[in-house]
Design a protein with these regions (language model features):
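Non-transmembrane, aqueous-exposed alpha-helical and coiled segments at domain scale
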Residues: 1-140
Length: 140
């Protein structure tokens, strides 16, 4: 069984469940679309702790129906994070939590809906960032 951490890859639910990985219970594409249209949560600095901790909190809130939008992720320093960690995996995260008894909880976190480089010399990235903060429909 070959599993891929991508939006297409997680459609093979049986393989992921057999591996003990919990998949998002919500419509990922709908959350991505709503977030892109009207961003509500923008986070600067998108490293490991952010992905599992803050991303995990947002994922739980979306799963519970307390939020209908994900997080717009902005990297200000190490742009390879976007290119090598976010983009190849469709912004999905495999969260593994080690518990005190040595067991693990594994889940796919899909709340990180867009990853942007705060790179002013790359017109598309910079324009998207400006668009987010100029969006009058953006939740306040």
């Amino acid at each position: 069984m070959k599993m891929k951490l991508t939006l297409d890859g997680i459609k093979d639910k049986k393989s992921w469940e057999a591996a003990g990985v919990v998949l998002p219970s919500y419509d990922i594409e709908k959350v991505k679309e709503e977030t892109k249209k009207s961003p509500a949560w923008v986070h600067f600095g998108i490293g490991n702790i952010f992905r599992i901790f803050i991303g995990g909190i947002a994922d739980t809130l979306i799963s519970n129906g307390a939020m209908d939008k994900g997080i717009t992720c902005v990297e200000t320093f190490d742009f390879d994070v976007v290119d090598k960690i976010y983009a190849p995996y469709d912004n999905l995260v495999l969260g593994v939590t080690l518990k005190a008894d040595g067991s693990t909880d594994k889940k796919v976190i899909a709340s990180l809906t867009e990853a942007i480089k705060a790179q002013s010399n790359v017109e598309a990235e910079w324009n998207r960032l400006k668009e987010i903060f100029q969006n009058k429909d953006r939740a306040r």
